[in-house]
């Protein structure tokens, strides 16, 4: 076992036997995929309604219409809807209703879509394929894409504030907005992307430093918005501080696991299978989990993160927690 791999495993807590019993109640793959599709259907409908192409049947002003088209292009089709689904499930887990968290769930997905648009720009990751189709700037141009990204983040705040009309207290709504703001800025996505860009030209003194940098980068770039989805959902559902913290810890593990598997698939699958450019990180010399610890060890780390995630769900209702257990299993097994 490589020293750098043993470092990261030593940081993981031992999994108690009770966690194995909890994981055994996760639904089957087919049941969960059906569950995901049903949730995604509700989410997609809400997202579609959030960005109209007309106003009371009157076409939008042409410049605004073009921005709306760009927003919809990245937001609506494709995507697993992991983040908004997590937001809804977290709300339900602590006793809330799906409808209560739907605006916030849409907001989280809008922030995610906005970040994808920026990440794909030539000055950032310079990608031309996303979800099996040309990236936003390839279709609408860089200027309109940047405007669309800005508009999506603004709309995310507006969506969350609309939760007050659903009976959510202003205090909870404010807390949710603060959590989203944290996830977007230099405590979250911005920091992660900056670290990703800097990592391309950075040298490390030893393997441990390289691994620590990689982990910190993806805590910010990937895991932070997954955390925000769970936290905001629990806030909307009226969860206690303890419940919110446990869901946040679960979501951090899930977010890191998602990135580990994303890196693995980038090296082991084709562009056609992934719906995006495969192998690009390897070509550009970016830090990835397979590069640091190898593909097999990266897969093993993802499995350990899965068990760690399940540990944080101890004590929740055994029926309501099934979707979260199944989500973690789904991510560690995913093929695209």
UniProtKB/Swiss-Prot annotation:
The biological pathway it contributes to is:
Isoprenoid biosynthesis; farnesyl diphosphate biosynthesis; farnesyl diphosphate from geranyl diphosphate and isopentenyl diphosphate: step 1/1; Isoprenoid biosynthesis; geranyl diphosphate biosynthesis; geranyl diphosphate from dimethylallyl diphosphate and isopentenyl diphosphate: step 1/1; Isoprenoid biosynthesis; geranylgeranyl diphosphate biosynthesis; geranylgeranyl diphosphate from farnesyl diphosphate and isopentenyl diphosphate: step 1/1
Subunit description: Monomer.
Q: Which cysteines are joined by disulfide bonds?
A: none
Q: Which UniProt keywords apply?
A: Carotenoid biosynthesis, Isoprene biosynthesis, Magnesium, Metal-binding, Mitochondrion, Transferase, Transit peptide
Write down the chemical reaction(s) this protein catalyses: isopentenyl diphosphate + dimethylallyl diphosphate = (2E)-geranyl diphosphate + diphosphate; isopentenyl diphosphate + (2E)-geranyl diphosphate = (2E,6E)-farnesyl diphosphate + diphosphate; isopentenyl diphosphate + (2E,6E)-farnesyl diphosphate = (2E,6E,10E)-geranylgeranyl diphosphate + diphosphate
What GO MF annotations does this protein's record show? (2E,6E)-farnesyl diphosphate synthase activity; dimethylallyltranstransferase activity; geranylgeranyl diphosphate synthase activity; metal ion binding
Function, as annotated, reads: Catalyzes the trans-addition of the three molecules of IPP onto DMAPP to form geranylgeranyl pyrophosphate.
Its recorded name reads Geranylgeranyl pyrophosphate synthase 6, mitochondrial
- Location in the cell: Mitochondrion
Q: Which organism is it from?
A: Arabidopsis thaliana
């Amino acid at each position: 076992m490589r020293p750098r791999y043993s470092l990261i495993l030593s940081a993981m807590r031992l999994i108690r036997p009770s966690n194995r019993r909890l994981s055994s109640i996760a639904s089957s793959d087919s049941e969960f995929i059906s569950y995901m599709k049903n949730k995604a259907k509700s989410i997609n409908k809400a997202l579609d309604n959030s960005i109209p192409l007309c106003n009371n049947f009157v076409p939008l002003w042409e410049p605004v219409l073009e921005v709306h088209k760009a927003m919809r292009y990245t937001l609506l089709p494709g995507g697993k809807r992991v983040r908004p689904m997590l937001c809804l499930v977290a709300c339900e887990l602590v006793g809330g209703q799906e409808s209560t968290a739907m605006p916030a769930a849409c907001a989280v997905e809008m922030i995610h879509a906005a970040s994808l648009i920026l990440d794909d720009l030539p000055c950032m990751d310079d990608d031309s394929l996303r979800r099996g189709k040309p990236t936003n700037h390839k279709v609408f141009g860089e200027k309109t894409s940047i405007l669309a990204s800005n508009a999506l983040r603004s709309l995310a705040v507006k969506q969350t504030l609309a939760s007050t009309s659903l009976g959510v207290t202003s205090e909870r709504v404010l807390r949710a907005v603060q959590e989203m703001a944290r996830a977007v800025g230099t405590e979250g996505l911005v920091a992660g992307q900056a670290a990703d860009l800097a990592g391309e030209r950075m040298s490390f003194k030893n393997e441990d430093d390289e691994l620590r940098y990689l982990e910190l980068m993806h805590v910010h770039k990937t895991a932070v918005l997954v955390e925000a989805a769970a936290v905001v959902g629990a806030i909307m559902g009226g969860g206690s501080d303890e419940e919110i913290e446990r869901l946040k810890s679960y979501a951090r593990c899930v977010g890191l696991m998602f990135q580990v598997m994303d890196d693995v698939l980038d090296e082991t699958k084709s562009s056609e299978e992934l719906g995006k450019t495969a192998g690009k990180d390897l070509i550009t010399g970016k830090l990835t989990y397979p590069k640091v610890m190898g593909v097999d060890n990266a897969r093993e780390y993802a499995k350990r993160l899965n068990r760690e995630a399940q540990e944080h769900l101890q004590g929740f209702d055994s029926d309501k927690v099934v979707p979260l257990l199944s989500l973690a299993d789904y991510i560690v097994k995913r093929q695209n």
